[in-house]
A protein has these predicted regions:
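C-terminal amphipathic helix plus adjacent low-complexity
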Residues: 305-334
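A nucleotide-sugar donor-handling region in carbohydrate enzymes
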Residues: 140-204
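Active-site and donor-binding regions of nucleotide-sugar-utilizing enzymes
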Residues: 6-20, 35-158
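Catalytic donor nucleotide-activated moiety binding site of glycosyltransferases and closely related
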Residues: 35-37, 44-64, 68, 194-197, ...
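Catalytic binding pocket for nucleotide-activated donors in carbohydrate/polymer assembly enzymes
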Residues: 259-312
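Structural motif
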Residues: 4-5, 91-94, 191, 244-245
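Donor nucleotide-activated moiety binding/catalytic core segment of transferases
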Residues: 71-88, 223-255, 259
Length: 334
């Protein structure tokens, strides 16, 4: 029996990333879940995907009153962990989360207050999440970053982290996705998933670029906007693979779609190491950064539309062992 672990699920992509690890964990494990519609839907409809565990729901610390929400979140996590330590199922010895710096802070020992949480694992693939990095740098014992991490974007986080650093060879999507069979021909009109973001996140205020209205003309659209997706929350990857293309403001959805072989137009100013890696490896990713882009919108959009018909010419991308790596670190065989 391994460490009793508290898993932090802050974003729908994090739920998918950690689901198998949770299934391989202990029945006494705990979940801290961010109360956002997509995360709640995934937990409520997670039979067969995500085991039922004692769960604490916490607010998303963004927008108006974000500091009050953050303080409430830290206090709630402290109480949750303290109660769990007294429930007779063993001490909580490890906390694992993706970008979950506030939980690391809550579980960190102080000179006046010891902590049973000996290991605090901070997983991240988002170099620009500087506020979370600053907290994690002082609170986490381990960090997991990809081999394609761009230190020039991380505000000095990796260079100054004094804990254990693990380098993941692959994207987060390589951990939880399984390649699906793609359509053999392009529909007429092309079937395209479109995802817009609400904004208001910790680090996305300077990254959002509106999707031009003309991008949606003449397409058969499946709407997957943030917090408004009407399909089964666990089947979004199937939707991505079964469509001809994707247009999105979300870097996470873009990365998952192209790993599944679906041509994707990312409309965003965001810079990430994993986006650079996908481009180097020839993934069907088309990027438009808005008015600041050196290329015309019409040219990028035309390339995307042409790319919908060229997926047969793509070589199958290699699938690195990121899943096995993460499992070995967090759920090693007894």
């Amino acid at each position: 029996m391994g460490m009793r672990t508290c898993w932090v699920l802050d974003h729908p992509a994090h739920v998918r990333l950690l689901a198998e690890l949770l299934r391989n964990g202990n029945t006494s494990d705990l979940i801290i879940a961010c109360d956002r519609p997509e995360v709640r839907a995934m937990l409520e409809q997670g039979d067969g995907k995500l085991p039922r565990r004692q769960t604490l729901w916490v607010p998303r610390a963004v927008g108006k009153g974000r500091y009050r929400k953050a303080l409430y979140r830290v206090r709630s996590v402290k109480l949750f962990l303290n109660r769990a330590n007294r429930d007779g199922q063993g001490l909580v010895e490890r906390l694992v989360g993706v970008g979950a710096a506030l939980e690391m802070l809550a579980a960190k020992p102080r000179w006046w207050r010891p902590s049973t949480v000996k290991e605090r694992w901070y997983i991240t693939d988002t170099e620009v999440n500087h506020k979370a990095h600053a907290i994690a740098k002082k609170s986490a014992t381990h960090t997991v970053v990809p081999v394609h991490w761009r230190a020039d974007l991380d505000g000095g986080f990796l260079a100054s982290f004094r804990g254990v650093v693990k380098r993941l060879d692959g994207l987060h999507g390589h951990v939880h996705l399984v390649p699906h069979r793609r359509p053999t021909s392009v529909a007429f009109p092309p079937r395209v998933v479109v995802r817009s973001l609400r904004g208001g996140g910790v680090h996305d205020a300077d990254e959002l670029v509106p999707i031009p209205e003309e991008a949606l003309l003449g397409l058969d659209i499946t709407n997957a906007d943030e917090d408004r997706y009407q399909g089964h929350p666990w089947d979004l990857d199937i939707e991505l693979a079964s469509h001809d293309g994707v247009i999105t403001q979300s870097v996470t959805l873009a990365s998952e779609a192209v790993l599944l072989g679906t041509p994707t137009l990312l409309v965003s100013k965001a810079e990430r190491g994993f986006l650079d890696r996908l481009e180097r490896e020839g993934a069907p990713l088309f990027r438009w950064r808005g008015a600041a882009d050196t290329r015309d919108w019409e040219a990028v959009y035309a390339q995307f539309l042409s790319g919908l018909h060229l997926t047969d010419a793509l070589d199958a991308a290699s699938w690195p062992g990121a899943r096995e790596q993460l499992t070995q670190w967090l759920c090693p065989p007894a």
